[in-house]
């Protein structure tokens, strides 16, 4: 039996990050966590490229362009969609998650979903570096592991 597992070793890997500017006070914390994780696991700062987009809905397009470029071992998608008083949240959260999943399958590049979808601002704050850890950090670790698995297979 051969077991394939990715390692959290980022040396010689290159990552693209696309992040929504809307709810930037949350997204910025996710970005800090992601960059921290990449550097702590050996990714050179010059091998991290960050693209800011207006909001979460725009993330999949830039993630797709990054994936198609074949310059990156993985793409990390960050942002925050917080439920408000209208149904806008439902549409944005659904389309962003579907878009990111489709890119991963179509382009065969790890495209990691690090977009918070929360019921309220408190939940978003908790997941951006307080009680529930930093989901940006976790997304970056997932990207490193997946990039290493892809390189093994």
Curated annotation (Swiss-Prot):
EC assignment: 2.5.1.78
GO CC term (a single one): riboflavin synthase complex
Keyword Transferase (UniProt): yes
Pathway annotation: Cofactor biosynthesis; riboflavin biosynthesis; riboflavin from 2-hydroxy-3-oxobutyl phosphate and 5-amino-6-(D-ribitylamino)uracil: step 1/2
Pfam family of the protein (one): DMRL_synthase
Alphabetized GO MF terms: 6,7-dimethyl-8-ribityllumazine synthase activity
GO biological process per UniProt: riboflavin biosynthetic process
Similarity comment text for this entry: Belongs to the DMRL synthase family.
Protein name: 6,7-dimethyl-8-ribityllumazine synthase
């Amino acid at each position: 039996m051969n077991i394939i597992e990715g390692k959290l070793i980022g040396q010689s890997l290159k990552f693209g990050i696309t992040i929504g500017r809307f709810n930037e006070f949350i997204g910025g914390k996710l970005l800090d966590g992601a960059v921290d994780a990449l550097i702590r696991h050996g990714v050179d700062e010059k091998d991290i490229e960050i693209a800011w987009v207006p909001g979460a809905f725009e993330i999949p397009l830039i993630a797709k362009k990054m994936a198609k470029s074949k310059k990156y071992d993985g793409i990390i998608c960050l942002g925050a969609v917080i439920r408000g008083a209208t149904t806008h949240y439902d549409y944005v959260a659904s389309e962003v998650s579907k878009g990111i999943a489709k890119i991963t399958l179509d382009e065969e590049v790890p495209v990691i979903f690090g977009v918070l979808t929360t019921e309220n601002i408190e939940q978003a704050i908790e997941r951006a570096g307080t009680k529930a850890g930093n989901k940006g950090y976790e997304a970056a670790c997932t990207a490193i592991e997946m990039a290493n698995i892809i390189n093994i297979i």
